[in-house]
Regions:
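Active-site-proximal helix-loop-helix substrate-binding element of RNase H-like nuclease domains
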Residues: 1-126
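Short coil/loop linkers at secondary-structure junctions
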Residues: 57-59, 177, 222
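Common nucleic-acid-contacting/processivity interface regions adjacent to the catalytic cores
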Residues: 71-219, 260-308
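Non-transmembrane amphipathic alpha-helical segments
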Residues: 235-252, 270
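Charged, low-complexity interaction regions
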Residues: 253-257
């Protein structure tokens, strides 16, 4: 079946058509890349060819075929010389000198029909799709193991909704009543200052590690209606998991850049997820466990820390 659905991209929402197959999770890997792209400005595109090169996952003998050639190659089944080292190919019979040279270098060239070439191209596409999924969708897979919904939905839904589903499931499991929703009020947000305009050299960047989640955990900023402490326990677990991935990314940065980038990509969805608890907490008209005073305490504490930096 096919139905209209929505993809949550940081602060934006994009409509798309979701294909569903009973008993399966149908995932479009480009959605995972788009979600990472929304918070990582170094990712300039979401296409498979670009993103595979971006994560250094492209095979040296990767076969590329222009989309206009796929049909003719497969239907005509003409012969090609395939370079097994770099994936490039030449049509047999165009130049006799090329044919002679390729026939002698059996260690580099092999003769292959167009339909087999197309199959190799499609196999490479599938292999790269799996590699991209391993890089960008593991955070969603981790969340899907805990949240009472499908992996398919977790891969596209907003993070505030995930917290709501987690707490609803927790309450149902432990026989807890759902708190009454409250009304939303205005409060002072984060600290923002522009001290200089223009071009600067020797810029020093200072950053807090997971500022809002850390404030909640260190200062115990959680609503009283969470009588079992579920929000604190889950936030602590996900924050520690993200820090572990960040530390592993730093540890392997000089010795194994590929592994370092893999851990870096895995921590991105978790970063969004743990930071979104503040958003959920500050929206009591939507999130039943929200508390405006708790949200205001988090931003107030954050401003104080920034002034002391």
């Amino acid at each position: 079946t096919r139905k209209d659905s929505m993809l949550k991209l940081a602060n934006e929402v994009e409509n798309f058509t979701q294909t569903s197959i009973w008993g399966y999770n149908v995932i479009d890997i480009i959605h995972a890349v788009r979600r990472a792209q929304a918070i990582n400005s170094s990712i300039k595109a979401a296409g498979l060819k670009y993103i595979t090169k971006f994560i250094n996952a492209e095979s040296p003998n990767r076969v590329y075929i222009d989309h206009t050639d796929i049909g003719p190659f497969y239907a005509k089944k003409e012969d090609f010389w395939l370079n097994i080292q770099n994936g490039k190919y030449k049509k047999v019979g165009i130049d006799s000198k090329i044919d002679e040279a390729c026939s002698k270098r059996t260690d580099v060239y092999t003769k292959i029909t167009g339909d087999k070439l197309v199959e190799m191209y499609l196999d490479d596409d599938l292999d790269e799709t799996l590699k991209v999924d391993q890089e960008f969708n593991q955070g969603s897979f981790l969340l899907a193991a805990m949240i009472p919904t499908t992996y398919e939905r977790v891969s596209t839904m907003g993070t505030a909704t995930l917290w709501k589903m987690l707490m609803l499931a927790w309450s149902y499991k432990h026989g807890l009543a759902i708190p009454a929703k409250e009304s939303k009020t205005d409060f002072v947000g984060g600290l923002s200052r522009l001290l200089k305009v223009g071009y600067s050299k020797n810029v020093l960047k200072l950053d807090f590690s997971s500022l809002y989640p850390s404030i909640q955990l260190v200062h115990d900023v959680f609503p009283d209606c969470d009588v079992t402490g579920a929000m604190k326990g889950m936030l602590s677990y996900f924050r520690n998991t993200r820090i572990k991935y960040k530390q592993l990314a730093e540890e392997f940065y000089t010795t194994d850049r590929k592994k370092s980038e893999s851990y870096g990509n895995k921590q991105l969805p978790i970063k969004i997820f743990i930071n979104s608890m503040f958003g959920a907490l500050s929206a009591p008209q939507v999130y039943a466990w929200g508390d405006m005073y708790m949200g205001e305490q988090i931003t107030c504490t954050g401003r104080q820390y920034l002034r002391q930096m």
